[in-house]
Amino acid sequence: MYTTAGMSSVPLTMPSPTHPVAEGDPTPDALLVDRLRKGETAAGEALVRKYYQPLVRYLQRLVGNEQLAEEMHQQTWLSVLEHLDRFDARHVTGGFKAWLFRIATNKANDYWRSSGRERAAKDGLRRVTDEQLPPADFRMEGTEQEQKLKWAIEQLPDAQKQVLMLRYYSNLKFIEIAEMLGCPLNTALGRMHKAMLKLKDLMAD
């Protein structure tokens, strides 16, 4: 159960990682956020349940550690509660989901930047490729080809890897990716374009 000074009347219970929760709550995020602001605990817990699995999976692939991902998941929701009054869906492309994942990305970036964590950051990016579904153009059969694809993805600059992961693992729209990364849409598109060209060159060798 988690609260913040600004919303002490709204405790949220985090799901247990040993008890998976259902995704796809049909209630619109905007409605749940509005109810949460009014102090409805159930609305906050519905949001947590809705995004628990994709958010934890995303964090786990960023930091490469299940326990750490769970901790960052909790920290992310604490930040959501702390800054919920500042959230305005009219000014956030992609809505609450984009805002939530951007907070999570910032948590991971803070971890990467902390003292002695540079190697862990690179390891986390490599782990992203382990279960990453590649673009259709690059789906191949055979262990050797799969290993070559993983190797090729590892050669990409970190910024390009991150866009690739968000697009093909989290299945996000580019406008949402840009909002999460805090960059212009054209920048996100450009990184993806360069990543695809680089992958084609590497796979052709």
Each language-model region and where it sits:
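Intrinsic, short, N-terminal disordered tails of RNA polymerase sigma-factor systems
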Residues: M1-K38, A46-K50, R119-K161, M165-L166, ...
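Arg/Lys-rich amphipathic alpha helix in sigma70-family domain 2
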Residues: D85-R86, R102-D123, G142
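Short, charged helix-capping/linker segments at alpha-helix termini
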Residues: E23, R37-A46, V56-Q75, L185
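Structural recognition of an alpha-helix C-terminal capping motif at a helix-to-coil junction
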Residues: E71-L78, G94-N106
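Amphipathic, Lys/Arg- and hydrophobic-enriched alpha-helical face
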Residues: V48-E66, H83-R86, I153, L202
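DNA major-groove recognition helix of helix-turn-helix
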Residues: W112, M192, L199, M203
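Sigma70-family region 2
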Residues: R37-K38, R61, W77-T93, S115-G116
